[in-house]
Amino acid sequence: MTSWAEKYRPKNLDGILGNAKAVSELRAWAMAWEKGRPEVKCLILYGPPGVGKTSAALALASEMDWDYIELNASDQRTAEIIKSIAGPASQVSTFSGRRRLVILDEADNLHGTYDRGGAAAILRVIKNATQPVILIANEYYNIEKPLRDACRGVQFRSIRAQTIASLLREICRSEGIECEPEAVMHIAAMSGGDLRSAINDLEAAARGLKHLRLEDVATSERDVKASIFRVLDSIFKGEDSRSALEATYQLDESPEDLIHWIDENLPIVYKDRELAKGFECLSRADIFLGRVRRRQNYTLWRYAAFLMTGGVRAVSSKVRRGYTQFRPPSLWKRLGQTRKARSVRDSAARKIAAHCHVSTSYARSELLNFVGALLRSKKTGAAVAASLGLNIEEIALLTGSSPTTKKVQKLFEDAQKIIEAEQIAMIDRGLKIVDREIEKPEDKAMKYASVSKEIVQEKRQRSLFDF
């Protein structure tokens, strides 16, 4: 399943938001390549995460009709690999004569065993390049100085919340989702200028819904540096278990929510033995969460949190880098899709509970199937539906049918007839009572006099003259 961040990635530079100056510099550099050799062979696109640096590089290749090759931080970038892959790509055009753009992502993370000699190899590639090269980094000054001197920096800045909100509304329209302006603006404001994070937050809140309200938004006022996606990065790619745990301290997600995120994305990052050990840690964490629910002892959260973060990080000895397309829990999507059905179910359970003098939870767990069986019976169905005051959607849910079926519609109509008959009977009884109450005083006096005379005659003792 393609994430929305990938699905709505810009296809050309006009789609890059909030960084018009950077886009202009990119276009000018590309046109210089088209006319011959530019002043610099390589650009460094730098700025905060999620502001469109990689998207701009890919959009440039698309707009200029260039081929491209991308080497990101998830790949091993030793001197030998860079020499064998990026080297030839930067010196030779395609068979059709098109230029080839070489993109190296996370250039400020060239360190460690896997990237040994990578910076020096990239510098040699740039010096010998006859094709355009782009380096992408978050921190400009984390790139080694010889590399910086061989390139020209192009800065990307954080994107304004209004600009982000405008794009989020367009995405909602494309997905057929009606969105409250406050909900979209809340996501945009909480993103801290990170467009990718905002789109991911929108997807987590809105996927499976038809109407997005403010209360549906999963994000809340929290440190934007501690978004769920950055926490997942720390868990799966952090230096150690402690950093994985500490990344959750400012996260506004309970362990019961966080475990669903990790469970969904664990198979994306880990494989084979690591995956099995990772799920074992999640299983143990879930045991502690169960104890929290049963005992209401929230101090046990700390053990669950460590197992699902530090424990999951500890099962892997690899140091992973680069961008991973994390996805929101599929469980939440299913809950969103069944929200209306659950609402109808709970409404029916409340009516049954009130009629039977039991709790709603008991009615929901024990009586729904029983009432459904009564509704399916021709003898009792209409009477039960009328007694409980069920609407057509509740009848359909309890009988396991669609509201549009003739059987459900007839049952609902019969129940309505019973209800109307009872209402008419109640009105008749009420009218009779009112008639008695508004009877004329002289009529009452004559009636009472007549009744009194009859009573006196009945109570009078018989005499001899009666025989």
UniProtKB/Swiss-Prot annotation:
Positions contributing to ATP binding: 47-54
InterPro entries from the UniProt entry: AAA+_ATPase, ATPase_AAA_core, P-loop_NTPase, Rep_factor-C_lsu, RFC_lid
Keyword DNA-binding: no
GO function terms (MF aspect): ATP binding; ATP hydrolysis activity; DNA clamp loader activity
Keywords assigned by UniProt, alphabetized: ATP-binding, DNA replication, Nucleotide-binding
Function per UniProt: Part of the RFC clamp loader complex which loads the PCNA sliding clamp onto DNA.
Entry's family note: Belongs to the activator 1 small subunits family. RfcL subfamily.
Name this polypeptide is given: Replication factor C large subunit
Organism for this UniProt entry: Methanothrix thermoacetophila (strain DSM 6194 / JCM 14653 / NBRC 101360 / PT) (Methanosaeta thermophila)
Lineage of origin: Archaea, Methanobacteriati, Methanobacteriota, Stenosarchaea group, Methanomicrobia
Protein encoded by which gene: rfcL
